[in-house]
């Protein structure tokens, strides 16, 4: 048991899916896993372990933002021995050729968070995905007939920005989407020498203003869940 996760030793698999929304964790477990067991309810951040096509898989909610996901990723790796972490989340599209409900595989992440500035004494660190997971997810998505977008994303430290046009500078440099966790996930994976990948569904669009409901975000973005799970069983 760690400070924020109530699981006992051996209850969490080496491969884990990380949705921000704990209710999405519950949906994934109940929809896709065989014999799911809830191992965590601390602070309402639900976590489950079951099997998917014969492989032991866990799914753990992380909450929103760099500080929250950092707590769970640190404890999952350090205290429970997790080796493969796949974030399944939502993002806002920044490019015209990316549509709502498209899949995005985050190859790398920019951020305005100061967390790595502090960690690296003011220097920059480039948080990147594990190629092993990136390739597995890309191949899986293509085999399923999907057309995933692969590229950089922007990890924002705040959801509400006083400068609503700030995202346009990132878009000019080819950034695909904005979310709030990937930079932290990739940095911690590098620190501990484990594998990490973010798979995103575009839930809203900064150019077209199209958006989805909270219920849709919770229960209908199943393509990324299937890609994550089928990629996970190849590891």
UniProtKB/Swiss-Prot annotation:
Pfam family, one: PNP_UDP_1
Binding site for a purine D-ribonucleoside: 4, 179-181, 203-204
Residues marked Important for catalytic activity (site): 217
Xref: InterPro entries: DeoD-type, Nucleoside_phosphorylase_CS, Nucleoside_phosphorylase_d, Nucleoside_phosphorylase_sf
Annotated signal peptide: none
Residues that bind phosphate: 20, 24, 43, 87-90
Gene Ontology biological process terms from the UniProt entry: purine nucleoside catabolic process
Source superkingdom: Bacteria
Active site: 204 (proton donor)
This protein's UniProt keywords: Glycosyltransferase, Transferase
GO cellular component: cytosol
SUPFAM superfamilies: Purine and uridine phosphorylases (SSF53167)
Role, per record: Catalyzes the reversible phosphorolytic breakdown of the N-glycosidic bond in the beta-(deoxy)ribonucleoside molecules, with the formation of the corresponding free purine bases and pentose-1-phosphate.
Assembly description: Homohexamer; trimer of homodimers.
Protein name: Purine nucleoside phosphorylase DeoD-type
Native organism: Clostridium perfringens (strain ATCC 13124 / DSM 756 / JCM 1290 / NCIMB 6125 / NCTC 8237 / Type A)
């Amino acid at each position: 048991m760690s400070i924020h996760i109530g699981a006992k030793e051996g209850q969490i698999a080496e491969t884990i899916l990380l949705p921000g929304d704990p209710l999405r964790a519950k949906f994934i477990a109940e929809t896709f896993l065989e014999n799911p067991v809830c191992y965590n309810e601390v602070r309402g951040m639900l976590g489950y372990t079951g099997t998917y096509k014969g492989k032991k898989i866990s799914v753990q909610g992380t909450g929103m933002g760099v500080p929250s996901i950092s707590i769970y990723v640190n404890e999952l790796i350090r205290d429970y021995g997790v080796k493969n972490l796949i974030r399944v989340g939502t993002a806002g599209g920044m490019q015209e050729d990316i549509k709502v409900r498209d899949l995005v595989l985050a190859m790398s992440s920019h951020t305005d968070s100061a967390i790595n500035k502090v960690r690296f004494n003011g220097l920059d660190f480039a948080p990147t995905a594990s190629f092993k997971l990136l390739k597995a997810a890309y191949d899986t998505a293509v085999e399923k007939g999907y057309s995933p977008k692969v590229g950089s994303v922007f990890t924002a430290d705040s959801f509400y920005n006083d400068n609503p046009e700030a995202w346009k500078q990132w878009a000019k440099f080819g950034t695909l989407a904005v979310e709030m966790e990937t930079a932290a996930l990739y940095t911690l994976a590098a620190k501990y020498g484990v594998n990490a990948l973010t798979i995103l569904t575009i839930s809203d669009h900064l150019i077209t203003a199209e958006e989805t409901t909270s219920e849709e975000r919770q229960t209908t973005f199943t393509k990324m869940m299937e890609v994550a799970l089928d990629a996970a069983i190849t590891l």
